[in-house]
């Protein structure tokens, strides 16, 4: 009993001590720094200019997300375009994401990167794609109906068996020689 009590006290002491110790540097290095978090929503033109400078944007191009309580702060509202639409032949600093150093990333970059959604315009309009899909489905349903109404079977000849048409297996007399069955003519 005393050993169990000592073990519980040891665990409690270890938990209290670990709260007071600073975390390891490698663990905290993966978190965002204070400068990376968006600041408060800009209310004045000076705050907008400072936020635009913070995100390496021109003041004319800077438009923050609306202050609706979602926590976007002063982060710029970038166009909802995927990375597929960016020039693949440009010499990007990070070619995998097609981003340059210091360029603001889209708030939903995990959704608009090249492995996910492609928002580039399609070469065929939505109406034409729907017409092609439903036209193909209607044609296939029609052909299945035609095949059901007018079945087609392969021509079949009479069944042929080995060993003189299975003479003994069908109850033939073993002492009698059966007539020879010829399945072909030459």
UniProtKB/Swiss-Prot annotation:
Top-level taxon of the source organism: Eukaryota
Feature: transit peptide: 1-28
Major location (coarse): mitochondrion
Keywords, alphabetical: Disease variant, Electron transport, Membrane, Mitochondrion, Mitochondrion inner membrane, Primary mitochondrial disease, Respiratory chain, Transit peptide, Transmembrane, Transmembrane helix, Transport
Keyword hit for Electron transport: yes
GO cellular component, one term: mitochondrial matrix
Disease per UniProt entry: Mitochondrial complex I deficiency, nuclear type 32: A form of mitochondrial complex I deficiency, the most common biochemical signature of mitochondrial disorders, a group of highly heterogeneous conditions characterized by defective oxidative phosphorylation, which collectively affects 1 in 5-10000 live births. Clinical disorders have variable severity, ranging from lethal neonatal disease to adult-onset neurodegenerative disorders.
Protein name: NADH dehydrogenase [ubiquinone] 1 beta subcomplex subunit 8, mitochondrial
Organism: Homo sapiens
Lineage of the species this protein comes from: Eukaryota, Metazoa, Chordata, Craniata, Vertebrata
